[in-house]
Amino acid sequence: VAIVDRNAEDGEKTAAAIRAGGGNAIFAAADVSDEASVGKAVAEVVGKLGPVTALFNHAGSIVIKPFLETTLQEWEWLMAVNVRSMFLMTKAVLPSMLKAGGGAIVCTSSISAVAATPNEVLYDTTKGACHMFARAIAVEYRERGVRCNAVCPGFIATPHGNREVEGLTKYGVDVSDPTIAMQQGRMGQPDDVAGAVVFLLSDEAKFITGTQLFVDNGFTAV
């Protein structure tokens, strides 16, 4: 396993935890929204571990504010973090994946790709792009042995999820515990999403590509 992130401290800790559990893991520092940085990191990973056969595009952030208060700079920044990162990482990894005979890619989208939320126009737009990026890659590379799917979490108890709840509450959007319980039963946990990602990357999902797996306990089914 290779972890590619700009947060070296947390990345190294995660790699160390994987190794402590008996796995083989390395960390490669990179800003995944920067082409040169991504190229260098992927070359390092391939040099140390060989061809990449599984890729999880998970970098993401959020902007929460009324649309008319958002700026072009915020739009471009969020597009870079949430969408350009997937483009760059996938483009850098695909050559070695194709050389290895195929592989699997999972992109983190969100319920926000299909369920709009007030004050999240920028975020919702990026997640809609993630949705279609995964589908388009799946269609183009199916015959070459590469699968690509999107995983779409609901509200998850992570630093990102907690920031979203705080930000929406600030603007009067009801994301209280009772409301979230009504929408999706409970707050999701990181393991709920991790299990779905591992499944989509595994051979158990060998006939699944170009789809979106909603990990939201029924949020989008209502």
Predicted regions and their residues:
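C-terminal substrate-recognition "lid" of short-chain dehydrogenase/reductases
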Residues: F87, R186-V215, T220
